[in-house]
Structures are given as C-alpha cells and as structure tokens.
Amino acid sequence: QLIVLNYIIPKLHRDLKLLSLKKCTKSFVTETLRTIVQLAFEDQLKEDNLLVLTVDGHGEVIQFKGFDEIKTYLADFPLTISEENLQLIDRLKKMSREERWKYWMEEMSKCIKCYACRAACPLCYCSRCIVEVNCPQWVQPWSAPLTNMEWQINRVMHMAGRCIGCGACKQACPVGIPLHLMTQSMMEDIQGEFGVAPGAINPAGNVLSTFKAEDKENFIH
C-alpha cells in the first residue's frame, strides 16, 4: 500500500511501512526527510520498519537504503532560514526587551489554546504533553496572554536543536500567530552561542539536553 503523508503521524511511527515522497516539492521532501532522521535519532523510528521513496529532478525514483543514506542526501540541502524570516527575526531582536515583550504579549492575547501548533508539529510526539499534566500544574489550562506565553516557551525549549524548519506551527495557528519565528530565532541563537548548525544531529544529545563545561554563559541573562 502506498501511503502519502504530509507529516509522519506519531501514531504511525512504529507501524509505518512505506512513505512515498512522490510529486512533492523539494522543501517538503527535505523537511520530511529531516523529520525521519530526527525521529530515528530519538529512537522513534526503526530502519526495518520503514521504506522511503522519492523522485529526483529527472523523474527517477530514489529508494533510500537506510538512515545514513538519507543523511548523505540531506547534506546537499542544509537547513536554512528564509531571507524573509531572517528579516523578521532581526526586527524583533532590534527591539528593546520591553518592546519585544509587548509584541509577544499582544500576539499571545490572540491565542485560544487550541494546541494546533502541537498537533501540526512532526516532532511533538509525547504520549502525555506537559500541558496535560496537572500534578504539578506546569501550564495553566485557561487561555490568557501570560499562560499562553508559558506554553509557547515550553514548546520552543522542547524544540531547541530539534526543529526541522517546516513552519507547520505557524500554518496551523487559526489566529495567525507567527510561532515559527520563536523556533527559528532559537535556531539562530543556538548556532551563534553553541556553534551548532540548524538541523545538525549531535550524537551526544540535543543541544539543550546536554552540558559541556566549556559552554559559553556570557549570553545568559
């Protein structure tokens, strides 16, 4: 059976047999392949449970033999932030701390806490999300600017060093909050402060889940 997916649905992670990327855009293909590599690194996918096919620019079918071959393919398509998003991030970073806080509070006032951003993300797969834990209550369940921001800070921290740059969080948001700017800004910060390129897989673990004595601390306020 041929299964065509926009993202690898978490419930299918362990049972998925065939993923076709036929007739998809280049960005779609690379985003999906990055998802596969990241999920495999996090032990959510096994090579013997997955067959990945795509079509090259000449219409020839490519069958990836394993995760290493996917990584080799992706080496020619490094994860980058679009010029438009870089300009938006730069505008945000040039704001004063107070201006930036006001901007995000205004955006968070629109949030209805539907968690579409979580549902759309190909790398949100926890069987029980932090927002569903009520003992202790990490994030308040009602919608209000401050608690909405608490939720997004948690989400972005969990995505740090893992985001594949697909922008699904922004696309899924029914009220148009530019959530992707948070994760993509984090990408920039991680590259600048830790020297880890966007989309890079660190065998030791994700950048914010590991510690090195030589890590810089001068940017922490």
Residue ranges of model-derived segments:
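Alpha-helix N-cap/helix-start capping motif
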Residues: T30-L33, Y115, G167
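Iron-sulfur-associated redox domains of electron-transfer enzymes in respiratory
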Residues: Q1-S109, P122
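Extended mid-to-C-terminal alpha-helical interaction segments
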Residues: S109-C129
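Phosphate- and divalent-cation-binding pockets in alpha/beta enzyme and binding domains
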Residues: T35-Q38, A120, A172, L181
